[in-house]
Amino acid sequence: MQQLTIAIDAMGGDFGPQVTVPAAVQALSQFPELKITVIGDRDAISTQLTHLNYIPNSRFSIVHSESVIGNNTQPSKALRHSRGSSMRMAIDMVANKEADACISAGNTGALMGLSRFTLKLLPGVERPALISPLPTKNNQRTWMLDLGANVSCDAETLFQFAVMGSELAEQTLKRKAKVALLNIGEEEIKGNDQIKRCAEMLNQCQDIEFIGYIEGDKLYQGIADVVVCDGFVGNVCLKTSEGVAHLFLDQLKSHLITSKFKQFIAKWLFGDVISCLKGLNPDQYNGASLIGLRGIVVKSHGSADVSAFNNAIKEAVHEVKRQIPNRISDRLEAVLLERHY
């Protein structure tokens, strides 16, 4: 059984150790091969362990950090003053081969900047990207990138995102991934110059199964396995989708589950429907990967609860086992060779 170690920024996110520590303990029971190092305020972490009646052992270790990078800290400032912070120390563990992956629910811009500075980019990669799965019909999923790491992207960067996203998705799908560019229409004449140029590049690439443009209303139809866009569009799209999903689920709860009797009736009459709707809960897909780096970094939502943060840990374990950075590097090299010849 492959042993693996994950470093967790225990102080990141809205709830810090109240979420990260229970999620880490839960993950240890799910993965016997897993070791976890939580980094943060030792007293705050120990308090949560006491609440859980959990005694640290050889699979759970604590590393004390002196500071936390705030949610409003500018990436440039985070780079200058990050030493001793829980986020920087978690990334450093990956860089120093002391951990196979790291997870943080902290400041996204700081995480991207520190990861890029510390871990460096894979050969040939211009920019890293945030990628995460979205639910689609028939209980399938579509991977979308970029989700906010890069506000604007040129055609070459979008092309690289398509290659990297394909490789990540195919490690789960076990087949060729269908790739689409998010656009304001499906016709070839639609879109800005970057999107049009990227479409030309993808059409010429035999290694990628490019199916053309896709509009926002088709994202959840399962038409494409990978959807590519710049980080501004991707982040707005993701946050809007999550907001609608939460609104729908909250409305469902308020109308159907106001008493034990109504809960019973709802479960009896609409059990399958309710189970299906729970699949829309964004918490199930928490854990966006920062791909294109020489190491594995997973970004959790800042508002994640224990279950959601646990899903981010699962994503990190998945990527370690499949050696995602190495596979992406090999795929990019193969595509570059194809384009050269």
Swiss-Prot record:
Its main location: cytoplasm. It catalyses: a fatty acyl-[ACP] + phosphate = an acyl phosphate + holo-[ACP]. Keywords: Cytoplasm, Lipid biosynthesis, Lipid metabolism, Phospholipid biosynthesis, Phospholipid metabolism, Transferase. The keyword Transferase applies. It is an enzyme of class 2 (transferase). This is Phosphate acyltransferase. GO terms for cellular component: cytoplasm. The gene is plsX. InterPro entries: FA_synthesis, Phospholipid_synth_PlsX-like. It comes from Aliivibrio fischeri (strain ATCC 700601 / ES114) (Vibrio fischeri). Catalyzes the reversible formation of acyl-phosphate (acyl-PO(4)) from acyl-[acyl-carrier-protein] (acyl-ACP). This enzyme utilizes acyl-ACP as fatty acyl donor, but not acyl-CoA. Homodimer. Probably interacts with PlsY. Belongs to the PlsX family. One of its GO terms (molecular function) is phosphate:acyl-[acyl carrier protein] acyltransferase activity. Its EC number is 2.3.1.274. One of its GO terms (biological process) is phospholipid biosynthetic process. It is found in: Cytoplasm. Pfam families: FA_synthesis. The keyword Oxidoreductase does not apply.
